[in-house]
UniProtKB/Swiss-Prot annotation:
Protein name listed in UniProt: Pesticidal crystal protein Cry1Ga
A Pfam family per the record: Endotoxin_C2
Iron keyword on record: no
A molecular function (GO) term: toxin activity
Matches recorded under InterPro entries: Cry1Ac-like_dom-VII, Cry_V, Galactose-bd-like_sf, Pest_crys, Pest_crys_Cry1Aa_dom-IV, Pest_crys_dom-III, Pest_crys_dom_I, Pest_crys_N_sf
Keyword Kinase among UniProt keywords: no
Role description: Promotes colloidosmotic lysis by binding to the midgut epithelial cells of insects.
Organism the protein comes from: Bacillus thuringiensis
PANTHER family for this protein: ENDOTOXIN_N DOMAIN-CONTAINING PROTEIN-RELATED (PTHR37003), PESTICIDAL CRYSTAL PROTEIN N-TERMINAL DOMAIN-CONTAINING PROTEIN (PTHR37003:SF2)
Length: 1166
């Protein structure tokens, strides 16, 4: 009631306050959200290990009970709390995802129930597998939408529900997977996803809860409502996510939530209480339970009210006489005698208040608003009421903000009152408010620390009754379910009173959930006697945030028993330097009979090691066991706990080393671990210089290679090796295989009689399916191979033996090739080639193997014999054809030189003749492998013999031409330029000088030998009217010139010059190695008619190969890309006898455009 200035009472609920009305409406509308969330938390706390009943329960509580309207309430609740309204489209999108998940999960539950009724039925197994995958895909697709940017807080409660559903689903698959028919590799992948998602979802929820709370600012109704409502709908559920780890928690687990939430202050809605959080909210503390409250009463304007109080509590496990008396809240007024109230009941569980009803009176007097509490009733679960001042007409009720399930408080309550604070406004403002603030803890946080014999008992360390010096209590990060303890120096954390209900012969092991910036030792004492001491590793670096991944659950391997049913358990830490940080969340007591994760890891490693060998005596490896798989098994062994199974770990390590040695022995590749590339000319790996060898990482245990892309497909990135013929067996199939971390446009070849070829694209860590969730680094920078990794499904097809190209969806690859007869003299061998010829291409690969797969029988044997015969037939044909081509090429090369020593060119040998001879040399087939032109082919020796002589010819030719850069391949280097001229590259890949203006001139000073004779030879073309001139002269007189015209009339030249046609005619005796005025290259050098026109490479085989073709880049070696001049170019020359040691060459024109291809000044032979 409100008292006016005339002391007339006005009903409290008639106060005109919009914010109060909003929050009253909010509480009535959104009670369903808290009720549903509390029900889910209780279900998760009470549920056992997975069974069909768990999925059914989850469906009944959440996914089968909520529709679009209910899901909208989850969204609208947070919208009002943070004052951020989302659009109808965004709300509809979120609810559509949730209802879709509900439908998919319903079908999964039906399939699970059907399978449970008939678990051995293959159809039932297939259906539940299919429904699991569809639901899993739906969640994986939908969750990112619920975490969309700028809506993370608004969607937080529904994100939590979907995340919980996903973890439940993944746990089902790990737990039931073997009986569903999933492979062990599938199950391991699902378990890795499960643990990775627990971390991801926990961090997401804690982060956005804390950010949303911080954005609200100072204490207010909104702040307390957000803290309370989202603790119930988000953080309580998140705190139980770790229990989904079925291997860490394989039996029922008893968890406790020790966090505190606050109901709104019991004041009138129009009162503004802008106080700091520190004055209202409790600092982190050891958990306590109310024993009694002493309430003091004051009076204002003749109205008695709650003016102050004292709280007397006990910590966990403490009895009478061990009380904590908190400082006085408010004032110890004496308008009425103090009232002491305490909960009543027969047991500690009954002696707890789950509800508080209050009567608030408000009135205005002398211009000041008053809001006071004049009566409160506290209810236990048996409806026993403890009343402060008898009253009637209670008008506020905490059950509106913390509802119970159903109508029976004994089974439906979720929270108990744990403390009472006090709100007092300043007496110097116009508003006068005095009211209690109630804080509550979850019912799962029991009044005792009882350790059960048949479950894993988790006890948060804040349930200690004594805090040791140097230990502090800090606010939890959000996913721990409460506050945590911290030390920065050695010593004990605290003492816990524990109760044992089982026979004292029951053995337990202790685990600790901790985070630490240092390696350290934990120890435990029971009643002052040391029970365990063990080494524990650091989990984080100094300054790191307390994220989920910083915490680790680890324990002692030695089991123990309690000697007393009521014992004191102490935990401490030592063995580290000061100023480090050590945090403990909880202690776990595990019945010794339960299989620890370490035991599971040992069993898994033993199975993996034994599965490597063909028999129990480890004589031989299984054929399908890859070198990469052996490395992974080695990692499993290395990650075993030294504390738990040191001897077994050593034994398994020796077996894995033996397996690795067997793998090396059967691998026919030299240097499979990439100790070097190009180290030995005829052995090991050969490759392009841009390939890098990198040490092992979290993917590869040993060295691996990285192949980058290339800007020119004719100069690819490559890596190759030849398998010697001596290592091969007749009529046997061999397999190349390995592991690719990622690749794009990686081509893999195996070549013998033909080429087997695959193009492999493997998405890597940046793909939709990541290889690893993280790349953790050890304390010394080494890769942490014990951290969970997400790998591709190894059951997917990893070879494409019948196709030319294959886009892999597996990191494993294999390619096989068949060997027929072997010939050590011929030494055909097998070429192994990796190549990338695109700019975007790349690859990282390792663990390469080339090994014997099986002998060839039946059809495979007949096929390889047929292929071998075809290859030999074509090889013989190639030899005949090569003899003809070689003879002609050699004659062309020999004609360039004076003698067989090849040390002097013929006097009339010109550049065109050398190019023409080079082209004939390049007509020799199979000089290099068409797949990779750096690998010599069957005709490499004769090709390189002639090509060396061509190189000599070019060198001799360059040496006798005294004009520098006469072919303009280096632009205008060495030339003096006046006016505007250009050097252009024409479509025949030649550089030409273009003189477009009559005033332009290009010249070069050349040193010569006086008294010797020279030939000036110019190849040029004139466009338009006028003449182009190339002049040679000395300082005084002795001038000659060559003129070029576009006129068709016959020109008259000096006696010492010849025309192009005359010159060409004179060269016919050298079998026409030049270009005439109107004569093309093909006419002068057509194809030899003795060579078949339909000649194809000898490895071409349509039925058995993948279409091996001649390498189009092979012609680019040396001068093979030389093409004839276009029609219209003319070559002219003159003889010149200098009288001094310097001459000048000048190029110009009178009109039009003058195009010069080359200028030569050649010393005549003596």
């Amino acid at each position: 009631m409100e008292i006016s200035d005339q002391n007339q009472y006005i009903p409290y609920n008639c106060l005109n306050n919009p914010e109060s009305e909003i929050f009253n409406a909010r509480n009535s509308n959104f009670g369903l959200v808290s009720q549903v969330s509390s029900g889910l938390t209780r279900f998760l706390l009470e549920a056992a290990v997975p069974e069909a009943g768990f999925a059914l329960g989850l469906f009944d509580i959440i996914w089968g009970a909520l529709g679009v309207d209910q899901w909208s309430l989850f969204l609208r609740q947070i919208e009002q709390l943070i004052r951020q309204e989302i659009t109808e489209l965004e709300r509809n999108r979120a609810t559509a995802i949730l209802t879709g998940l509900s439908s998919s999960y319903n079908l999964y539950v039906e399939a699970l129930r059907e399978w449970e009724n008939d678990p051995n039925n293959p159809a039932s197994q297939e259906r539940v597998r299919t429904r699991f995958r569809l639901t899993d895909d739906a969640i994986v697709t939908g969750l990112p939408t619920l975490a969309i940017r700028n809506l993370e807080v608004v969607n937080l409660s529904v994100y939590t529900q979907a995340a919980n559903l996903h973890l439940s689903l993944l746990r089902d698959a790990v737990y039931f997977g073997e009986r569903w028919g999933l492979t062990q590799a599938n199950i391991e992948d699902l378990y890795t996803r499960l643990t990775s998602n627990i971390q991801e979802y926990s961090d997401h929820c804690a982060r956005w809860y804390n950010q949303g709370l911080n954005e609200i600012g100072g204490i207010s109704r909104r702040y307390l409502d957000f803290q309370r409502d989202l603790t119930i709908s988000v953080l309580d559920i998140v705190a139980l996510f770790p229990n989904y780890d079925i291997r860490t928690y394989p039996i029922p687990t008893q968890s406790q939530l020790t966090r505190e939430i606050y109901t709104s202050p019991v004041v009138a809605g129009n009162i503004n209480f802008g106080l700091s959080i520190a004055n209202v909210l409790r600092a982190p503390h050891l958990m306590d339970f109310i024993d009694r409250i002493v309430i003091y009463t004051n009076s204002v304007r003749s109205t008695p009210y709650w003016a102050g109080h004292e709280v007397i509590s006990r910590r966990t496990g403490q009895g009478q006489g061990n009380e904590i008396r908190f400082p006085l809240y408010g004032v110890a007024a004496n308008a009425e005698p103090p009232v002491t109230i305490r909960p009543t009941g027969f047991t500690d569980e009954q002696r707890q208040w789950y509800r508080a009803r209050s009567r608030v009176v408000s009135f205005r007097s002398s211009g000041q608003d008053f809001s006071l509490v004049d009566a409160v009733g506290f209810l236990t679960i048996f409806s026993a009421v403890s009343i402060y001042r008898n009253g009637f007409g209670f008008n506020t009720d905490t059950i509106d903000e913390i509802p119970i399930e159903g109508t029976d408080p004994f089974t439906g309550y979720s929270h108990r009152l744990c403390h009472v604070g006090f709100l007092a406004s300043s007496p110097f403002i116009s508003q006068y408010a005095r009211a209690p603030i109630f804080s509550w803890t979850h019912r799962s946080a029991t009044l005792t620390n009882t350790i059960a014999p048949d479950v894993i008992t988790q006890i948060p360390l804040v349930k200690a009754f004594n805090l040791h010096s140097g230990a502090t209590i800090v606010k939890g990060p959000g996913f721990t379910g409460g506050d945590i303890l911290r030390r920065t120096n050695v010593g004990s954390f605290g003492d816990m009173r524990v109760n044992i209900t089982a026979p004292l012969s029951q053995r337990y092991r202790v685990r600790i959930r901790y985070a630490s910036t240092t390696d350290l030792q934990f120890y435990t004492n029971i009643n002052g006697t040391t029970i365990n001491i063990g080494n524990f590793s650091s989990t984080m670096d100094s300054g790191d945030d307390l994220q989920y991944g910083r915490f680790r659950v680890a324990g002692f391997t030695t089991p123990f028993t309690f000697s007393d049913a009521n014992s004191t358990f102490t935990i401490g830490a030592f063995g580290f330097s000061p100023n480090n940080e050590v945090y403990i969340d909880r202690i776990e007591f595990v019945p010794a009979e339960v299989t620890f994760e370490a035991e599971y890891d040992l069993e898994k490693a033993q199975k993996a090691v034994n599965a490597l060998f063909t028999s129990s005596n480890q004589i031989g490896l299984k054929t399908d066991v890859t070198d990469y798989h052996i490395d992974k098994v080695s990692n499993l062994v290395e990650c075993l706990s030294d504390e738990f199974c040191l001897d077994e770990k050593r034994e398994l390590s020796e077996k894995v080393k033996h397996a690795k040695r067997l793998s090396d022995e059967r691998n026919l590749l030299q240097d499979p671990n990439f100790r070097g590339i190009n180290r030995q000319p005829d052995r090991g790996w050969r490759g392009s210089t841009d390939i890098t060898i990198q040490g092992g990482d979290d993917v590869f245990k040993e060295n691996y290679v990285t192949l980058p892309g290339t800007f020119d497909g004719c100069y690819p990135t490559y890596l190759y090796q030849k398998i010697d013929e001596s290592k091969l067996k007749v009529y046997t199939r061999y397999q190349l295989r390995g592991y690719i971390e990622d690749s794009q446009d990686l081509e893999i070849y195996l070549i013998r009689y033909n080429a087997k070829h695959e193009t492999v694209n493997v998405p890597g860590t940046g793909s939709l399916w990541p290889l690893s969730a993280q790349s953790p680094i050890g304390k010394c920078g080494e890769p942490n191979r014990c951290a969970p990794h997400l790998e591709w499904n190894p059951d997917l097809d990893c070879s494409c033996r019948n196709g030319e190209k294959c886009a892999h969806h597996s990191h494993h690859f294999s390619l096989d090739i068949d060997v027929g007869c072997t010939d050590l003299n011929e030494d055909l061998g097998v070429w192994v080639i990796f190549k990338i010829k695109t700019q975007d291409g790349h690859a990282r690969l390792g663990n390469l193997e080339f090994l014997e797969e099986k002998p060839l029988l039946g059809e495979a044997l007949a096929r390889v014999k047929r292929a071998e015969k075809k290859w030999r037939d074509k090889r013989e044909k190639l030899e005949l054809e090569t003899n003809i081509v070689y003879k002609e090429a050699k004659e062309s090369v020999d004609a360039l030189f004076v003698n067989s020593q090849y040390d002097q060119l013929q006097a009339d040998t010109n550049i065109a003749m050398i190019h023409a001879a080079d082209k004939r040399v390049h007509s020799i087939r199979e000089a290099y492998l068409p797949e990779l032109s750096v690998i010599p082919g069957v005709n490499a020796a004769i090709f390189e013999e002639l090509e060396g002589r061509i190189f000599t010819a070019f060198s001799l030719y360059d040496a006798r031409n005294v004009i520098k850069n006469g072919d303009f391949n280096n632009g205008l280097s060495c030339w003096n330029v006046k006016g505007h001229v250009d050097v252009e590259e024409q479509n025949n890949h030649r550089s030409v000088l273009v003189v477009p203006e009559w005033e332009a001139e290009v010249s070069q000073e050349v040193r010569v030998c006086p008294g010797r004779g020279y030939i000036l030879r110019v190849t040029a073309y004139k466009e338009g009217y006028g003449e182009g001139c190339v002049t040679i002269h000395e300082i005084e007189n002795n001038t000659d010139e060559l003129k070029f015209s576009n006129c068709v009339e016959e020109e008259v030249y000096p006696n010492n010059t010849v025309t192009c046609n005359d010159y060409t005619a004179n060269q016919e005796e050298y079998k026409g190695a030049y270009t005439s005025h109107n004569r093309g290259y093909d006419e002068a050098y057509g194809n030899n008619p003795s060579v078949p026109a339909d000649y194809t490479p000898v490895y071409e085989e349509k039925a058995y190969t993948d279409g091996r073709r001649e390498n189009p880049c092979e012609s680019n070696r040396g001068y093979g890309d030389y093409t004839p001049l276009p029609a219209g170019y003319v070559t002219k020359e003159l003889e010149y006898f200098p009288e001094t040691d310097k001459v000048w060459i000048e190029i110009g024109e009178t009109e039009g455009t003058f195009i010069v291809e080359s200028v030569e000044l050649l010393l005549m032979e003596e």
